[in-house]
């Protein structure tokens, strides 16, 4: 028996309600899908995936299915309820509450979120399931600050796929766009069985990296540009040519262009233009070091086979563990040195006054700060 309380999310195919379950004696989420909005095959696929993920040993960071019902008009999936909603809305609130002079009171444990998200993805892949729609809107947050990966409606029980229009455009891997595969795949009456396959796990790795970028900066790496002939990621060619210069232009330069000049200390200007306050990422240098790790391990363009979530996790663990075991002042200076070395881009697309060579690098050890 369920008592619907209120709608908490409405999408193209389904509406999700918060409800009280007398059977489970807890709040639950009812995902109600009208039968005319989806096929029986699609719903069966989602049900089968959720049944596997919600087996006798469900993963703590995956939103489990508690029950399932159907009648003449609707499919009703009973899911775990997460009190704090999704990360997209949560960060939107944090962004509106915070500013350089009055930072947000909401703090998010970035290290925990990354590890839990990677653990959930790895668990699903170990069961032969790829999510195919990883994004902040599908990451739910509990009252304890833990995450649960949700909405497995696009999931597939296969490491390979030739579906090129699955997922959310801003987070989709480049190989899943029609503009980056053979145009013959999209001709009318084309036999999809002969279309080239992409690796669904490696596509998930890309989406993971794009999602973490959004969590750090509140802005997607790319936006999608569409036309009748081609669909592609806007500015993607710039990223493919030089990802570090692209990230510098997109995320660093805007934070330097708000009234700062050549003489302004880059260290100060970056620190004062932080967008979010992370519990375990106390400064912008940690954030941009994480950017480099993601580019090196997750956001590979030309060869998706080089993407590795295992390498990403190992490098992140190494960076955090190294910092925690070192003297804080020495560690902080190392991070500044690393930032200067990695992000000293010199490209004509970056105005000269925003290039690192025109800023004085802080020397905390020498100055005794």
Swiss-Prot record:
Which Pfam families does the record match to this protein? Answer: Pkinase
Protein kinase domain mapped to chain residues: 2-369
User: What is the first-listed, main subcellular location in coarse terms?
Assistant: mitochondrion
Q: Does the keyword Nucleotide-binding apply?
A: yes
Q: Which GO terms describe its cellular component?
A: mitochondrion
Q: What is this protein called?
A: Probable serine/threonine-protein kinase FMP48
| Coiled-coil ranges per UniProt | none
């Amino acid at each position: 028996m369920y008592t619907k309380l209120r709608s908490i999310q409405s999408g193209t195919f389904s509406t999700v309600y918060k409800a009280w379950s007398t059977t489970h004696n807890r709040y639950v989420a009812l995902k109600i899908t009208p039968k005319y909005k989806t096929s029986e095959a699609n719903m069966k696929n989602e049900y089968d995936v959720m049944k596997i993920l919600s087996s006798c040993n469900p993963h703590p960071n995956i939103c489990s299915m508690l029950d399932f019902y159907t009648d003449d008009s609707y499919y009703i999936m009973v899911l775990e309820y997460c009190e704090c909603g999704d990360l997209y809305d949560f960060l939107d609130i944090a962004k509106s509450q915070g500013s350089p002079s009055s930072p947000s009171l909401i703090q998010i444990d970035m290290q925990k979120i990354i590890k839990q998200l990677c653990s959930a993805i790895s668990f699903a892949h170990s069961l032969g399931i790829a999510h195919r729609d990883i994004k902040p809107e599908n990451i739910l947050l509990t009252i304890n600050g833990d995450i649960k990966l949700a909405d497995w409606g696009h999931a597939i029980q296969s490491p390979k796929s030739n579906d090129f229009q699955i997922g959310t455009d801003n987070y989709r891997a480049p190989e899943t766009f029609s503009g980056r595969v053979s145009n013959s795949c999209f001709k009318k009456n084309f036999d999809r069985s002969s279309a080239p396959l992409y690796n669904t796990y490696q596509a998930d790795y890309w989406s993971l990296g794009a999602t973490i970028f959004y969590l750090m900066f509140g802005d997607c790496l790319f936006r999608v540009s569409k036309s009748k002939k081609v669909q592609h990621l806007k500015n993607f060619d710039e990223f493919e040519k030089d990802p570090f210069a692209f990230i510098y232009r997109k995320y660093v330069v805007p934070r330097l262009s708000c009234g700062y000049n050549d003489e302004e200390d880059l260290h100060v200007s970056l620190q004062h233009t932080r967008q979010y306050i992370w519990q375990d990422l106390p400064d912008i240098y940690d954030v941009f070091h994480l950017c480099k790790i993601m580019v090196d391990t997750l956001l590979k363009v030309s060869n998706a086979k080089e993407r590795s979530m295992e390498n990403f996790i190992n490098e992140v663990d190494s960076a955090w563990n190294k910092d925690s075991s070192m003297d804080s002042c020495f560690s902080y200076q190392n991070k500044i040195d690393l930032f200067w070395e990695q992000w000293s881009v010199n490209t004509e697309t970056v105005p000269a006054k925003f290039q690192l060579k025109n800023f004085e690098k802080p020397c905390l050890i020498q100055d005794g700060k």
